[in-house]
Amino acid sequence: MILQFPLWWYAAPAILKGWIERVYAFGFAYGYKNGANEYRFGDGILKGKRALVNVLTGGPAADYGPRGINGPIDQLLFPLTHGALFYPGMDVLPVHAVHGAAHITTAEEVEAVKSAWRVRLEGLFTDAPIPFRSQNGGDFPDRHTMADHVSPEKTGLVAHLVDETAA
């Protein structure tokens, strides 16, 4: 699944959220297999499917960097990537962003955006997904709270990412 949208007030537009709320009905995206919370965050009905978010921003890339004024784009979109896409089991690819979209005016800039998108799509089925911690992978023994021994130095959103350097 590819979701493409402009970033509006630091999130997806309301119409996209409305679509998710209507399509992700009980028994499908949540409440899967008799409604228990056993099959979620990596193990839902969409396990094995891939998802990619292509977002267009008004500001430059620097605004969405690790120390940018708007905050990292990956963290801004965490409710979508981790919540709406990973929750029902999808392998979520790193976000593709077109920054300063409204200011792309020359043919060269347009071609650069198109070229970057082509390259991104070439890896749609081979690129590594975001290494979110799965609910049933051992890091959440009660399915709700991360075990104390798992990345004790991390809190917040980054704690939900597997530290690949430790593996």
Please report, for each region that a protein language model flagged, where it lies by residue.
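Glycine-rich phosphate/pyrophosphate-binding loop and the adjoining helix
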Residues: 63, 67-167
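Helix-loop-strand module that forms the ligand-binding subsite of alpha/beta enzymes
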Residues: 1-81
